[in-house]
């Protein structure tokens, strides 16, 4: 397998992994069903995107260049998308608490158990939505990377 094939198949692997995770997460988000497997898949997809970015760096160091400079944008943006998605995920809890006029997590503890569970589920659902959407965006970018080598 040559450098070109390695770059293309690496991008396809990132696209498939993140596409599956994104679709699974979107389905679980729609059904209000938190999932441990989704979060493991998200982390695996992010790890694969990071490994692909390292491969791109190796290709640059080996003076193996794609046919289009856009390749670098499509190949490296998934790492940035993952970082931005994590930042948005961190804001999700604050948004849910603000929506329910709660100051902080300690204020949630004063609520009845059913309301606490509803707030936790709302936070998890919002986080899943953000990360599922990010995984789908990474999928599209990786497919574009494969097409621009």
What are the roles of these predicted feature ranges?
Residues 1-149:
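Polytopic transmembrane helical bundles with strong interfacial aromatic enrichment
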């Amino acid at each position: 397998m040559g450098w070109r094939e390695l770059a293309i198949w690496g991008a396809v692997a990132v696209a498939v992994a993140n596409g599956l995770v994104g679709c699974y997460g979107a389905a679980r988000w729609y059904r209000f069903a938190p999932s441990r497997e989704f979060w493991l898949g998200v982390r695996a997809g992010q790890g694969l995107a990071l490994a692909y970015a390292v491969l791109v760096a190796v290709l640059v160091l080996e003076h193996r260049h794609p046919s289009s400079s856009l390749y670098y944008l499509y190949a490296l943006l998934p790492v940035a998308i993952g970082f931005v998605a994590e930042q948005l995920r961190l804001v999700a809890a604050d948004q849910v608490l603000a929506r329910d006029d709660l100051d902080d997590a300690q204020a949630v503890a004063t609520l009845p158990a059913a309301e606490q569970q509803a707030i936790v589920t709302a936070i998890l659902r919002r986080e899943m939505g953000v990360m599922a959407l990010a995984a789908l965006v990474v999928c599209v970018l990786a497919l574009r990377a494969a097409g621009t080598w």
